[in-house]
Amino acid sequence: MYAKPTCPTPLKILLVVVIVVELAAIGLLLAGRAGASEGRDSAVEASASTTPAPTDTPAAPAASDGGETAGGDKASSEPVTLTVTFAGDCTLGTDINYENERSFNSRWQAEEGDATYFLRNVADLFGSDDLTVVNMEGALTEGGERADKKFAFRGKPEYAKILSSASVEAATLANNHSQDYGQTGYDDTIAALDAEGVQSFGYDRVAYVDVKGVKVALIGSYFPEDSAENTKEMTDNIAAARAEGAQLVIVYVHWGQEHEYDITEGQQTAGRAAIDAGADLVVGSHPHVVQGWEVYQGRYLVYSLGNFCFGGNTNPDDKDCLIFQQTFTVTGDEVAKNDDVDFIAASVSTETDRNTYQPVLAEGDEKARIDAKVQEAADRIAAAS
């Protein structure tokens, strides 16, 4: 016989309900913790995939009250020193009417196109400064028509590598041979220099180069004869450069009488006019020989550096040349007047009986002789002034 089932009391029912509720609460709590843990893991993965890796660039230092940064960097009014080197006539080529086994082109072929051959002896000097400037005299072109004149010089466009291989950064084209092959040759020369990173300038083309944060203006002028018109073009360019914010203005002039060791009155008049107009330095070439120098209003005028890497003559009678170097101190728009200059004696050739087209620094007795020669020329200028 089966026992009769009994009915649960209210107390038992209440206990069962409490137990069920507690179990449900525990389950929800465990589920919430698991979900939170999963959410954190997902957030870390997303952050790792979207946040870029830190760079080595430090945060910019905060500016201090004195116009300086907290790191100690000065404002632009701090003095900046820069060294600029100048060399003379670079005729990288030959007149086709005088081509022979001793010509510049023949030397290029003998060196199998090694552009470093020509300026090898001065490359270290040029590489140690902040800017090197030469006179590029002749056309670098395969085209154009030869001018009807006694000497017209042309070289291959690739000859521009001769300059760039020795840290020559700029070249004036204001001279009597840059247009020996017309406008085509002139334009090709500019393009050839541009391709090698050599800044050309001259006539109405004023070049502006940034050297250690200093805006330098390079002005090239050609004086086929002493004239007020040439002087005005030069001084107008100087004024324009100043208006453009140039801090240092350099003028490279092609002037004077060929093969004359003494300057003309016109050279001095024009050179001093350039200084009066605001130039900080005037250097010159064209006579094919070195001339003297003077200081006017605290600025240097170096009248002729002579030839340099000169393909215009297989054996020049006078192989002496000069490299001029000046270190400028620029503070804002002010250029200090100083005598931090160097007149470096050199020769256009490593041989005395022929032109090797490889300028070399003079040493020993040769250096002393050239130094004395330049000083004597400077003394004559001073005596006549």
What are these regions (language model features)?
Residues 2-385:
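Acidic, metal/ion-coordinating pockets
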